[in-house]
């Protein structure tokens, strides 16, 4: 059995099998004892709006708050799930130019994306006393129907597209 936390239960109901249990708030759970694993990919989309001070707070809190709530549920569980897969992003590395980076890289920059991800991961790691924690550092979504590529296609279709930056930068994508 799967349980999905969603802001839009009615929309999710149209897209998911009937056997999936839908909840709209973590307050509907008192522990995580019935689950084998928890996957947390929640968060305000980062490419939909300008990164104003207010929007940065929305982006940050949408990730940090739910992750903190999940850590509290792990803490309250007598038989917690075996693994907690929590979202993060390659933004944690910042722009490192030609430097190759991996999960052991520790010279994190002091910019919004890096600080957002570093704190998000730190909150998730608070569950490490109760379960195995894995932070999934995803990249930019390149899909014609969603993510960054969907946003970039229209200008190109109108003949207005061109190189992004100098064209020499690295870009990890999914």
Where in the sequence are the language-model features?
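Conserved catalytic-core motifs of eukaryotic protein kinase domains, centered on the activation segment
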Residues: 15, 48-54, 95-98, 167
